[in-house]
Amino acid sequence: EICACLVGSEMCIRDRSYCYYPWFYYYKLIGNANAIIENIDNASGSNEEKLFIKAQALTFRAYSYMMLSQLYCHRWCDSNNGSSRGLPLRIDLSTGELPTSTLAEVYGRIYEDLNEAISNFTASELDRSSGDNYSPNLDVAYATYARAALTREDWATAARYAVLARANYPLMTNSEYVDGGFNTPNQEWIWSSYNATDQNLHYYSFFAYQGSNSSASICRTYACSISKELYDQIPETDVRKNMFLGPKEGETYTTSTGRASKGALYDRAMKDYADKIYSTSYIFAYMQFKILCADQPGIGQLNNFRSAEMYLIEAEANCHIGGKDAETQKLLVALNKDSGRNPAYTCTKTGDDLLQEVKLYRRIELWGEGFDWFDYKRWKEPIVRKSYPEGSFHIQFAITIQPSDNNQWTWVFPAKEVDYNDALSSYIE
């Protein structure tokens, strides 16, 4: 998400790591999954264990192709119903030249893998250990299905699997939300990526780029902040508003940089958020305190799926299905009021106004978790970056990025893939 937000809709140089690392990473997962899928039947162990492990591998493969398609393929609404260029679909251990499949064929493979994974998980009657949130299980397959279907604009399928995915994961409490709810698995987390003191990425981790309490220099000197435009739309009664340092009356900051080096805003930050700031951190207006590292410099488990996203997937899908305004209103009330995030929340909106409400609360609830760029791409909506005086970006980044800009936000295939896979020669952008 960091790479996508910074360069994904503006530039993508074929031989730079920003472009090729996601390709390498997800195809590495796919290759490992293929090895398991091809060989698990001949491994030792019970049939139930084999079914469970194969289901996990299929889920990893489906998840990886879903992520790759969002980066390296056109958004579904621009794909001519999936007939546009997709990805090389490697589903075995062969390494020869391989042309791309269509985007529809990519999603067909994702669905097929998840259907088989769900069947195998169910037949195995096994589940992961309670502490192994990083290990895929049946609910992870459901969640992957829900997100993939949403991205494909398969609304009924997205809603169906979102309900199944969240069934065993109640929304986190307010105390969990504001204190470590995004670096350590809790009751709401469906699936996460493991990271701990004995196995971590040090200064390359997500939390070493975004954690407000991280000792990493990028976090101490350039704090991640919410846009003023979004902050102002969060109700005062909403606990999520307290996750950001919004200036109050009489609190000032340097509008050319966003920094507050002294004064009332600085003093309040150092007092009210002392346990969420590294001792030498710079203070910025609208800086975030939602994403915290569990240990230095950037240790923390990275959430991949949680129940809140599933509520929002079902709500968005309902808006497109039509005739489900009442159900969608109830979903938003459950997420915002019943959870305790905003006890004063109500929703009576209908039609397109209701869809816009869902989109707004998707931005609020999932802020900082890696969704904005992907959402704006699939929504086919412009990203509007405002300058520091308006509470957001440095002036040179304060631009508007249209959905049609830069190859419709579609990343180019990495040079290494094109150089060694001659079957892709006709697909060079």
Where are these regions (language model features)?
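Single conserved hydrophobic/aromatic residue that forms the stacking wall/gate
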Residues: 1-8, 13
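Acidic/polar-rich alpha-helix caps and helix-coil junctions
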Residues: 17-207, 232-429
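Von Willebrand factor type A / integrin I
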Residues: 185-186, 213-218, 224, 228
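Acidic-aromatic pocket-rim loops
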Residues: 201-220
